[in-house]
Structure formats: C-alpha cells, structure tokens
Amino acid sequence: MENKEIIAVIDLGTSNLKCAIFSFGIGELPKLIGFSKKKTKGIHNSIIVNMNDAIDSVRSCLIEAEKKSQISLNKINVLIDPTEIITTRLTKFKKTSGSKIEKNDVSFLLKEAKKQVELNDSRLSNIHIFNYKYVVDNKLFKDLPFNIYVDQFSQENVFLGVPKNILKNISEVFHSCDIEIGKFISCS
C-alpha cells in the first residue's frame, strides 16, 4: 500500500466486537480494506469484565481484520460507550475591557476549564471536549467571533469523562495484543 495512510478502529460498545481497517491517499475517500465482527467475550458495555476473555476476543477480531486487509496493525482507535460516562459542563468568563477576542484567549479559557475539571475529579479521564456556546457582551453566539472588540465573553465547554480504571483495563487488553491505542472515541 504505497503512499497510503491506514486508519483502524474497533468498536467495544456492543455485544459484538467490530474492527474496520481503512486505507486512503491524499484527496481520496477512505476505502474499507478489512473488516471483522466477533461475539464479545470478557467485555460488557465497553467495560472489561474478564481480562483473559477480553484479550482473546480482541486478538481474534484484530487477526481476522488484519488477514482480510493484508495489513499488520500497530495502532488502532477504540470506540467505547461505557455506561459510566460523566458529562460536565463548565463556563469560564473573561473580561477584556474593550480589547479584541483572540484565539489565545479562547485557548486560555479552555485550558483553565480543563484544569478545573481534572482537579475536581482526578479519577476521570476526559476523552472528548466540546465548545458548547459562547456569550459575547451578553449575546449568545454559536461560533465565537474573533477579532472583534468586546467587554467580556464566556465560553461553555462540555467534557465527557470516563473513569481512568476503565481506560487502563482497555489499554491493558490492547497492550497484551501488542497494539497501541491511538485514541478513545465515545460512540455517544
């Protein structure tokens, strides 16, 4: 697969494991080159309930998809949908006293919000962060208008967190299968 990128995903959120491997080049749509579906054992609602069964299930699903695609994977993205997802909304404010809103202002507020959420519950790992809404001089905006003069603005973010032990157990399964997790993606 010369000059082709490979993306692989595995879905742990159902009663069946589903693994898909895609290839694509610059300017191309992804093409499915390998797929497998196996009955889940040792995993319930994206939670590892039996480590050995989970390792066997994941390994079997990966091997079948790799054979079909003729690719040996070293990294995969993991789709999860655990019932323990915690959603947190947090709004951060900034007074600008008539100066322009810049991207670094938004980045600063996001970093502060993330830090506050992490300090509030260190048992959680944030897998997704969404910008939910912006309020600029008491007016609601879907997208933040940059480079305009304002007195104050706020940014509301939504954080999706999962208990770290759930992610550690999933990581252990994939480590035992000699494959790195690229990222966790929530199906919700």
Language-model features, listed with the residues they occupy:
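Nucleotide/phosphate-binding catalytic cleft detector across ATP-hydrolyzing
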Residues: 1-16, 20-76, 80-188
